[in-house]
Each structure stands twice: as structure tokens, then as C-alpha cells.
Amino acid sequence: MNTPIYQVDAFTERLFSGNSACVVLLAEWIPESKLLKIAKENAVAETAFLVMNGGEYHLRWFTPDIEIDLCGHATLAAGHVVLTHLAPDKNAVQFRTISGQLDVERDDTAYRIALPNRPPVPAELPSSISESLSLQPQEVLKARDYVLVYASESQVADLQINREIFDRINLDPGGVAVTAAGRDCDFVSRFFTPQATIMEDPVTGSAHCSLTPYWSERLGKKSLEARQISHRGGELRCEVTGDQVQLFGNAVTYSVGHIRIDED
């Protein structure tokens, strides 16, 4: 069975930057074990699987290791595929997901995705995280993910993690966001997941569900410009609107093709 697949760089206007996601279009759901094999074979941070059922798109996300409950950049990539390749006459699409309905809209300049607002609260840092860090944070908070706040952008950029120690803890489906005020934007971040095939995520939309409310309150701003300073880098505009976080970003298609899924 030949199945359509798209590879998209999300939260960027340029190829080979942002965060790459694969979007696989399925006629119906196949066993979870096979979804995981496809995600592992794709070897990108996340693969989004789409099924049209009853006139609605149903969306699931897989890393090379597990199914996860939310993925911002793969949702943006899926929205880009639908609105650019499948239904270019439309400007919005809704996805049914384990985290509820997620909307992706397109205007003249960017895509907008609405994700759950997850304000972080003060927390204790597990020793397997603190001992793995080359520099301790000024502040520790937690929602789904741990949020570690540093004094400067350079501290975030230079931070090193001892993977052997870091991998002693399992935070599925969460991870660790490290953040600081930015020099030429409102805030910067990096994101790490222990025990994951890909430890540092290039751009993490879901982490901004907690980063955005934190920095919005701290800076007293509604609209924030953010950069994730991974090796690929990515840019987002973020806003808190009630129980949602609005993320604005671009996406570009890298490849279009088919994969072979043999019948069992």
C-alpha cells in the first residue's frame, strides 16, 4: 500500500531550519506498533498521522520512541499540508486530537495554531536533572514540562547536559525547557527530553504553552517574539488568550512522496 507522506520544516521561512516533521496521510488507522515503526524510520523529531473520518481530520503524533499527547510543530506541519497541498482554497482546518480540538488558520503572513494554556508553577528540580546541568537555573517551574529560567541568553546557548545522568529520569510525555530573556526578542529557549532518541528538539511548540504565560506575566506583554536557539533555530510569535496559547509561525515543504506500508 502506497501512502502519501510530506516532510515539512515548521516555525521557519527557510528550508533546513525550524523543526522538521513528517505528515503521513492514512485512509484509516493502522496498528499503533506500525505507526511507531514508521515514525522511527522517518527519523525526525515527530511524525504526524492524519486520518479523514466523518468529514473531520483526526491527528496523532509519534516520536521515534512513543506516542505523545501534544506536538506544536507537527500540528503546524499538518495544517500546512492540508491548507497548501490538500485544500488550498481553505484558510483554516480543525484537527481532532487526544488534547481536544486544535485549530490551524492561515493569513497573508503566517499560520496560527491554538494550543492549551499551561502556566507553570514553582517546583523542585529532580537530582537527575540538576546534576546533569553544567549551570544551575535561577528559577524552577513545572507544568507538563519543567521550565528552567536562566539569567541570560548566553547561559541558555552555552548550557551543556550530561546525557548519562539526564537519562536516569523518565518524563514522558514531557521534557525540560531552558529559557531566558532574549537580546533581540522577548525570550529564547531550548528543549530537552531524557531517554529520547533525539535529546534536543529543534523547535518545540508545545513547550511554549508554558513559556508564553510565564514570560507574558513577567514582561507584562500580550504579544511576544520568541526564538528557540537550537542548532537549526526557529522563530515564533506567541500570545495568551484565556485558556489558550496562540502560536504564529511559518512552514515550508521539503519533500512530497509515498511510503510503502505492507499489509500484515
Name what the model sees in each region.
Residues 1-70, 75-264:
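Active-site proximal loop and beta-alpha junction motif in alpha/beta enzyme cores
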